Amino acid sequence: MAKGDIQTAPGTGLVGKLTPDQKVLLKQMWAEILHIADGNTGALETVPTAAAPAAGADKAKKGGWFGGKSADTTAVVVPATKVNVAEIGIDVKQLRTALWNNILGDHPDSLLLRFLRARKWNVTNGLTMILKAFKWRLEDDIEEVKSKSEDELDAKYRGFRLQMEMGKSFVHGTDKLGRPVVYINVRMHKPSEQDPKALEKFTIYVMETGRLMIQPPVETACLIFDMTGFSLANMDYNFVKFLVQCFEAYYPESLGVLVIHKAPFVFWGVWKIIEGWLDPVVASKIKFTRNDKELTEVIDANHLPNKYEGGKDKYTYKYTPVVSGENDRFKDVETKNRLLDEWKGILWKFEAVTKEWIQAGGKNASGRSEEEIEAERLSLAKELRVAYFKLDPYIRARNLYHRGEQPVLQADGTSIWTYNN
């Protein structure tokens, strides 16, 4: 472990479960991100007074949804990191948009904590990692898979909808720890049947949709790679590299367990290659199951589809196509803008209170107790979640999990799974 790295003790490092040291590092991470988002490209090197604006803040610019608002230039008081924003190459004007588009309905601290845990609480490394992830999200247009329907995505990326129609991958139910379960039927994959970009976009689609199903306090997902019937014709090394990169660089700390189920003998030669690509954290989350009954060690029998021996849930995956008119709320620009303004108003308050929280106890403190400030941050985080999911149907296309008589994804952001036992 590198100098300055800190292991996350069990039961810590999560929203509401921070040690004093972890809280300080989270404050520093927030301070740096807000400093950059306010238009500064250099590291936070000074400790300005509370009455003075941070250096360069008078030149702050906004991008995306935040183009018309001036930055709150309240100074932040933390040590500097050594991150060169110019070298990373992210457009500072788009940073705030990337940040809040990524947070969705989660507690804002949750996102930053994922990157801090992934980099063992080294703020410089965590900040570099999250900025690179934001750059990827902007350059690869991750919002596209949320704002476009499956039919629109299929028209642009050959084979996108095919992944859903064949049931190559889908989400159903939760495991014993309450994590949503993503099933991947590897035998269905033939590299030539879709454009590589379509498979990447579908993977991101599953990631972004699956995030909606991770319900607090749960923070991770369970993946089942069903290797039944696998042959070398199904192997796609480029896709595996992309998936590994997603979990390690773009969606860190999102994987709870990855189960490789019933891998045939031919897979073990492939595994020796893949194993070398994995960082120790991801590798530690991989579990092998030899038969169907072993799956019940991970997933309760009542939640496990009965296609697996020991499973009691009479569930069979079936794709429900796009429903005509399901995204008509996109046309209601007036309501969308009103809800967007309400959501933005709350997040601006959250940022302002976060800056106050960063300074709590220091010479530039506001005078309110840290406990009082934290209570307001928590209240605002809850308001943000409510406001986001009111806005969601006006900016996110409805998907498979919004459809049907018993949809999984609810209007308030909760998930309801139906099991047929």
Locate predicted features.
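Basic, amphipathic alpha-helical/coil surface patches used to engage anionic, phosphate-bearing ligands
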Residues: 1-421
